Amino acid sequence: MALCGVCSTPNLPNLQVFRSVRNSSIGYKRNHSLWQLRSSSFRAKSVIFHCSSSLRQSPSNVEEIDDNPSVSLEDESAHVMQFKWSDFRILDRVSIGHGGRADELVFEAIVQVPDSPLFNQGVVLRKLNTTRAQRRGRRAIEVFKKLVRRRLLYHSYSMQVHGYITNNLSDDQYSFTLVHGCHGSFSIRHWLQQSDWIPTLEATLALDEESFRRVGDDTTGGPAVSRQLRLIRTLMRDILIGVNYLHSHGLAHTELRLENVHISPVDRHIKVGILGNAADFNGDVPSTSNAYSTMDRRQMMIAFDMRCVGFMMAKMVLQELMDPLIFAKLKSFLAKGNDPSSLREFFVTTLNTNSESGNTGVQILDRNWGAGWHLLSLLIATRPSERISCLDALKHPFLCGPRWRVAPSMDIIRWGLGSTAVKISEEYIYRMPQRQRLAHFIGLMEMLNPYPKPNCWLELLPGRWRLLYSTGKHIGLTLRQPSTRALIGNVHLTITRASESINNTSLSFTSDIRFTAITSKDWPHNKIGAAGKLQTLSQFRLIAGKRLYLKEEKKNIGKFSMGEPDAEEGLAEKLETEKWKKVVPFKEFPSSLPVAKLVSGEIEVTMNMNDHIDSPGSVIGEVRKQIPPEMFDLSKLVCGTYIDSRLLVLRCVNGSALLFTRSSLDHKSM
């Protein structure tokens, strides 16, 4: 749907450009006495900007005449159409996707002017009744005139603004009616609320093999997870291209929501909504500002748009977030300062994942070694400077199909190793192949530790960590008949820093083991018993250290042993391959690696039980058999070998490793 002609010269309110004393940027002021302006006089005179300021200006700034015909005001205004109410046939319905705000009246109409290039086409009329709403409408026209120079991209990724309706003498002179394109009946939010949205949206977008090849995939059909992933890739790439188009023109959308994004059934492109609140990167910059502050403003506005895109992606993948209550939990999770890299831990415990096939959205984000979680964490990162840009997001593995070869960064490689280790630990089938793979992945993570210095550990260690896996001995209940059975719940390690001082390296470690003691002879089906909590508290000092890799002959390990058979030897063979030589920062297996050494102090152990039991000693003994001994005796923790914003690996005296994930669970949760 292209703009092919003009009805008449626009009759927008005359804009007088002024330069304020405090603000050197150019602003706009409406002159009510010049509300009506004849088109003949408008075209006959040159466009002169009168600028005034108490500061001394150069002569070139006092009076500026733009002689470039390609960017003249008259040429830009030629694309804005001027309508009358009689030019439309108002329909008796309004599609749900065009719902307006409280200060708007929304109509759907058909253009009835035979000479108009929009003849017999559907449009949307937005009557803006308040000053703030009118400001949005006029801003949308200003942005349209700025972007229309590149019509192809504008028409493909932005909702088309055609013009406005002039006011008759009998009409309210302060009302303003915007005329823009009608791109389907639904916004993306309303599409996702349909029960059969996947096949319906596939049909609307006319997705075929050629369409999927554009996102790096050459398959069609398949299970619902694969179909939804291909749809999300298509929609997200279109959204990012449209948002990047705005950012490259010095504009930020500032209102990116699912309700404002539409899908056109004509060109099958995403329309990023009316740009009534679009903001200029360089607008309203104080005169005392420098290039750094201008760039900082630009980054902040781009980061705000990327955060909005991240929320849109989260709702498209995890449709439970369409519920305002669940979405409020997500906003609260982020507002409390939790790192977005631990979103998976939050969602798995918040969403309903008890169905037979699991949660579809979680499965989509888990694919490709957790690439979806990585992209989502970058889009809604806590610090604006850490959020990903549109161009980098378009090259992210999650949005690139299997046929596209994407060179992963070191950060993505570490993320993939950690995500794979987490997935294996969740299977809870700890036979020898799984144990070998987990030990192998943990060893690779330690080789690629991004934060070897103790100062980084002091910043990242504080928090609440949930135990995922131990490479040491595992003693369960299958082959034993204990007198008192204990069902282990969550095991957490809470680390707090004594002081924020740089020289203070003291840390407080608290091991929190929650369990249920079952005193009956046989296992009951409902697993009801006396709830208890075992806590161990110890103080640690953090200093720099090294972990030595001793090159000595390995002893043969029996078939039924629970140790780590040739973990370091297999790791050394892996690092010698051509694939890993390009990734690891060293050419051969190192003899030592820097670690964060932990020096422990005294230990304090407490146990609380909700109900009275006859033999608390036997309960403690049973709990100690099932958990890693290092979680009971914290003095056996000797060093930290890997840490990032999501995962933690601690090594023990006997050489075993403990894998933790950062948790935001309530202290009262089991």
Curated annotation (Swiss-Prot):
Q: Which GO terms describe its biological process?
A: response to osmotic stress
Q: Which residues cross the membrane?
A: none
Q: State what induces this protein.
A: Up-regulated by salicylic acid and down-regulated by jasmonic acid.
Q: Which residues form the Protein kinase domain?
A: 88-399
Q: Where is this protein's transit peptide?
A: 1-52
Q: Where in the cell is it found?
A: Plastid, Chloroplast
Name the organs or tissues of expression.
Answer: Expressed in roots.
Extract the Pfam families matched here: PAP_fibrillin, Pkinase
Q: Name one GO cellular component term.
A: chloroplast
Read off the Gene3D superfamilies from this record: Transferase(Phosphotransferase) domain 1 (1.10.510.10)
Query: PANTHER family from the entry?
Result: PLASTID-LIPID-ASSOCIATED PROTEIN 14, CHLOROPLASTIC-RELATED (PTHR46699:SF6), SERINE/THREONINE-PROTEIN KINASE STN8, CHLOROPLASTIC-RELATED (PTHR46699)
Give the protein family. Belongs to the PAP/fibrillin family.
Comment block on domains: The protein kinase domain is predicted to be catalytically inactive.
Protein name (record): Probable plastid-lipid-associated protein 14, chloroplastic
The record lists the organism as Arabidopsis thaliana
